[in-house]
């Protein structure tokens, strides 16, 4: 079971009303969270230093086995280049993957003195919808995330940089982006975390 390797600054709780931002990216077998497979999930925690400067901290990720009866849309698989049957995916069942990730995040949340985690994502509604659907299928009771509040870097990117596309917002923020790595849950989550922290640091503390 992965464990936190850093100490989280409890100062974070004062910046986001008791929420710990967690950047999430999912890769899926389609666009419908009720019927389509969740295939990858990555979570990136954020932390801040003694001066209150935010930075991406730790990453936890899993490949996930499609749930029984899940739809695998060929168009979606062509985009994310995932082969759900590949033997080296080492995929976990949804419940096992989420429970491991949530335990990791809950430890960070406790250290940061936060009440809940809040999902950060690029077009965050999509990631939150798939996450909530997987939680419901798995009947997980201890969900660290707020059920509907989220921070959307597409919206924030439009506000800060006039761009809603992740690659373009990163370019405006002078953060590298490799199109060959795009649609990997880990890569997209880590780049989104860099973008989120850059925007938070630019905005400053209230």
Describe the role of every protein-language-model region:
Residues 28-30, 155, 191:
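Short, glycine/acidic-enriched loop or turn micro-motifs at the edges of active sites
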Residues 109, 126-148:
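Substrate-recognition/cap helix-loop segment adjacent to the acidic, metal-dependent catalytic center
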Residues 31-33, 158, 194:
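Conserved protein kinase catalytic core
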Residues 63-87, 153-189:
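Active-site-proximal helix-loop-helix substrate-binding element of RNase H-like nuclease domains
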Residues 25-27, 127, 152, 188:
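Acidic active-site catalytic centers that drive phospho-/nucleotidyl reactions
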Residues 2, 16, 140-141, 160-162:
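Catalytic phosphate/metal-binding cores of nucleic-acid and nucleotide-processing enzymes, i.e., regions
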Residues 118-125, 129-130, 134-135, 167-206:
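Acidic, Mg2+-coordinating catalytic module of metal-dependent nucleases/exonucleases
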Residues 2-122, 183:
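Conserved non-catalytic scaffold segment of RNase H-like nuclease domains
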